């Protein structure tokens, strides 16, 4: 099953376990957010929204907040010794799609537990 969602003015086709980068969404790392603007649900019997599918949402886990690549805008007016250089970086949220929900259901899965790094085993002294 797949869904077409709209967030940040862009549309994305998603399936469960997809990882995607979208414009900044409020939420702490590791929390589950719900994306409510579902334009289409696909599968055996596709549902097309007018403009959105009623009662459908997509649950996603926030993996990271970061900044995108620098975009430079350079304007030059020839023969006038006039130029302007500006740059910016978008704020990006990395999401993992956990579930596609229909009929107003709530997400059944909570946030995944944090990974704990395994402590290295104490090295046995070879000299003894």
UniProtKB/Swiss-Prot annotation:
Keywords, comma-separated and alphabetical: Ribonucleoprotein, Ribosomal protein, RNA-binding, rRNA-binding
GO function terms (MF aspect): rRNA binding; structural constituent of ribosome
GO biological process, one term: translation
Compositional bias per record (Low complexity), positions renumbered to this chain: 119-128
Classification via InterPro entries: bL21-like, bL21-like_sf, Ribosomal_bL21
Record has Ribosomal protein as a keyword: yes
Cellular compartments per GO CC: cytoplasm; ribonucleoprotein complex; ribosome
Region (Disordered): 104-128
Family statement: Belongs to the bacterial ribosomal protein bL21 family.
Function (record text): This protein binds to 23S rRNA in the presence of protein L20.
Subunit structure: Part of the 50S ribosomal subunit. Contacts protein L20.
Stated name of the protein: Large ribosomal subunit protein bL21
Organism of origin: Rhodopseudomonas palustris (strain HaA2)
Gene: rplU
């Amino acid at each position: 099953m797949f869904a077409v969602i709209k967030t940040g003015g862009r549309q994305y086709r998603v399936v469960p376990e997809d990882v995607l980068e979208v414009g900044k969404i409020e939420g702490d790392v590791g929390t589950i957010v719900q994306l409510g603007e579902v334009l289409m649900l696909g599968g055996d019997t596709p549902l097309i929204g007018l403009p959105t599918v009623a009662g459908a949402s997509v649950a996603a886990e926030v993996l990271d907040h970061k900044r995108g690549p620098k975009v430079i805008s350079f304007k030059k007016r020839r023969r006038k010794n006039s130029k302007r250089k500006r740059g910016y970086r978008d704020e990006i949220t990395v999401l993992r799609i956990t579930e596609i929900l229909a009929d107003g259901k709530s997400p059944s899965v909570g946030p995944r537990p944090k990974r704990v790094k395994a402590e290295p085993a104490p090295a046995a002294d070879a000299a003894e």
